[in-house]
Regions:
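Intrinsically disordered, low-complexity, charged terminal extensions of DNA damage-control enzymes
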Residues: 1-113
Length: 113
């Protein structure tokens, strides 16, 4: 699977905000929260969707499949309206259940956010 996550960041009144949504698909990540996701059928599509924004690409191995994931930071003046997402304070992100893949990538971003 080829996953492309976008971490939208918007600063307002000295607070940083982002968008997340809760997964409802019947898989191991059901009920976990994640950033805005686009999924691609193959590597060519995934590579073609790359942007010049700060990003981290990684491979995550599950027991039954290999996930190729890219997380891209997009700093915006206004958060986009995206169905099924919620706007939260970045400082409250730890109150939401995230996948191990997402947590590991956030650690790698470190001071970029």
């Amino acid at each position: 699977r080829w996953l492309d996550y976008t971490i939208y960041l918007c600063k307002s009144n000295d607070e940083l905000y982002t968008l997340i949504h809760q997964r409802t698909e019947q898989d191991i990540w059901k009920h976990l929260y994640e950033f805005v996701l686009n999924e691609y059928d193959n590597e060519e599509q995934w590579l073609a969707a790359a942007t010049s924004h700060s990003s981290i690409a990684t491979t995550h191995i599950l027991s039954h499949q290999r996930l190729h994931a890219r997380f891209t930071i997009r700093k915006v003046d206004i958060l986009p309206v995206i169905p099924d997402t919620i706007c939260i304070r970045w400082s409250e992100l730890d109150q939401y259940a995230l996948s191990r893949l997402t947590l590991k990538v956030l650690e790698r971003f470190g001071g970029l956010i």
